[in-house]
């Protein structure tokens, strides 16, 4: 990784630390349109089995998305990241591990889906406007 590309990742990790320690906006609801410069989506524990969050920042900036906490039951639940609005190309479905995504876009969609009757497992999804645009 070149130094120029390492800077946004360092900013993401340092900002993720700030957000997870009380700086930032926390979302626990199932889905919605989020237009803040940064925030954290936490495990939704309600009755709905599918949640869709549309993330959008000013078009002159890019979004960085990090999934530092993801311990889902593979085969029964997943988080999917789309490169734009709902219905856009999928960047992947994730059920465990650490994932960091930067697609050069000002909008992304995050979808959480689980089987009916299966309890929600813990996840944390951090989004952040890239200050370097």
UniProtKB/Swiss-Prot annotation:
Keyword Glycoprotein: yes
Record-level GO cellular component terms: extracellular region
Keyword Transmembrane helix tagged: no
CDD domains the UniProt entry points to: CUB
Pfam family for this entry, one: CUB
Tissue: Seminal plasma or sperm.
Main subcellular location: secreted
InterPro entries given in the database record: CUB_dom, Sperma_CUB_dom_sf, Spermadhesin
GO process terms (BP): single fertilization
Name under which the protein is recorded: Major seminal plasma glycoprotein PSP-I
Organism expressing this protein natively: Sus scrofa (Pig)
